[in-house]
UniProtKB/Swiss-Prot annotation:
Protein name: UPF0597 protein VP2173
Upper classification of the organism: Bacteria, Pseudomonadati, Pseudomonadota, Gammaproteobacteria, Vibrionales
Signal peptide: none
InterPro entries (alphabetical): Ser_deHydtase-like_asu (IPR005130), UPF0597 (IPR021144)
BP-aspect Gene Ontology terms: L-cysteine catabolic process to pyruvate
Membership in a protein family: Belongs to the UPF0597 family.
One Gene Ontology molecular-function label: L-cysteine desulfhydrase activity
């Protein structure tokens, strides 16, 4: 296999990972768990959490898995007391009711504080634990598990090199990559080299089934299932994709103790990249190899498009993730590369106005909306209908992707500030 394709696999493995719970509060839990390990004790007097505005925004309304509670305080406190520092985004996989009760006691005793910090980094979290005379601080920046510094009693015991400190820089930087190259890689790479991506289908399908079986969040998936059973909605491709994507997000945002396969640090975007493809493969009766190729196309396509703008911006990343999923739907349906590009153009034209106003249960509605757009856009593409040279959509797909990046980087910082101010009022 050529070096370029090896790079693509490395990128996917770097940012498509299992994650238990919304990744923003989980970043605080992870930092706290690492700090406790360095501290050498769970006898903690105080916990101080400092985060970027964007990480704060995405932690305000989402349940922390295994706790039944919302926010950074419970995430940091239970992470500090019982989190597994070796498990990264699955740091809270083994907590129990006693751990949660002890963490809540720290909060009730006002020993846990959270503050916003003025920083240029979108993903930033610093957790400081105090036990007697000992103080340990762990700082994460540029990625949800990207530790850049550890301090103990004022001494720096770990300091990341400069190239590791700005991980929000594109993971695709310096890599020869485009939508066409992604398509060729996904359709031509040896199956044995890419079949690892099938774990995304396994994990996110289990999460969707959990959302169907139990009541989480707004219960969008369960609501759609009930209406299908009553005959108010058809049991067709569109409805099944809507049901399964929203059910997975319901469970994800509602604190289910099952991991999602995330994409670029987002569980919901991992769901949006996975579940439409899984459902379509079932409907079209594609085989396992075709499913794997479509998932590679969807996940890597989403990573590539999102590499043009910073994470945790005011732009809802489910839009462009669903654009990549729509591209994969065309492949599963036997369409051409040109039609796959049409699908991306159509999705971006349709739903690029969707903003991110924090992680919360209603994110499942946005996942459902963007996935619906993916299906409609694939259907249009198969009929050779494509938006071009309208609004931010350019003549061809690469221009459109660059336009999205420009819109987010230069046009949406004030929108982001306004959203955070409204949420914090």
């Amino acid at each position: 296999m050529n070096q370029q394709w090896t790079q693509y696999i490395q990128i996917i493995k770097q940012v498509v990972k299992p994650a238990l719970g919304c990744t923003e509060p989980i970043a605080a839990a992870y930092a706290a768990a690492v700090a406790r390990k360095e501290l050498g004790t769970s006898d903690i007097d105080a916990i101080e959490v400092r985060v970027s505005d964007n990480l704060f925004k995405n932690s305000m309304g989402v349940f922390v898995p295994g706790t039944g509670k919302i926010g950074l305080k419970i995430a940091a406190s239970v992470g500090a007391l019982a989190g597994d520092p070796t498990a990264e985004l699955e740091v809270l996989a083994r907590i129990n009711e006693q751990d949660v009760a002890a963490a809540q006691q720290l909060i009730d005793e006002e020993r846990v504080t959270v503050a916003r910090m003025d920083t240029q980094e979108f993903i930033y979290c610093s957790v400081t634990l105090t036990s007697g005379d000992d103080v340990v601080s762990v700082t994460i920046s540029g990625g949800h598990t990207n530790i850049i510094q550890i301090m103990r009693n004022g001494d720096v015991i770990f300091d990341a090199p400069p190239q590791q400190r700005v991980a929000t820089a594109s993971v695709c930087e310096g890599v020869d990559i485009s939508i066409k190259q992604i398509y060729e890689f996904a359709t031509q790479a040896p199956f044995e080299e890419i079949k690892f991506i099938l774990q995304a289908a396994e994990l996110n399908t289990l999460l969707a089934q959990e959302g169907i079986d139990r009541g989480y969040g707004l219960e969008i998936g369960r609501t759609l299932k009930g209406n299908i059973e009553q005959g108010l909605l058809g049991n067709d491709l569109m409805s099944r994709i809507q049901m399964m994507t929203s059910a997975a997000s319901d469970a994800r945002m509602g604190g289910a103790t099952l991991p999602a396969m995330s994409n670029f640090g987002s569980g919901n975007q991992g769901i949006a990249a996975t579940m439409p493809v899984v459902v379509a493969a079932e409907v079209f009766q594609n085989d396992e190899e075709q499913l794997a190729r479509a998932l590679i196309m969807s996940h890597l396509g989403a990573i590539y498009i999102k590499s043009y703008y910073p994470p945790l911006s005011a732009f809802c990343g489910n839009t462009v993730t669903s654009a990549a999923a729509s591209m994969a739907l065309v492949y599963l349906a036997g369409g051409t590369f040109e039609q796959s590009c049409y699908a991306i153009q159509n999705v971006i034209s349709d739903s690029s106005g969707m903003v991110c106003d924090g992680a919360k249960s209603s994110c499942a509605m946005k996942v459902c909306t963007s996935s619906t757009t993916a299906v409609r856009s694939y259907l249009m593409a198969m009929g050779n209908h494509s938006v071009k040279n309208q609004g931010i959509v350019g003549e061809e797909v690469e221009q459109t992707i660059r336009n999205v990046g420009s819109m987010v980087r230069f046009g949406m910082p004030y929108t982001d500030k306004s959203i955070i101010d409204i949420m914090s009022a």
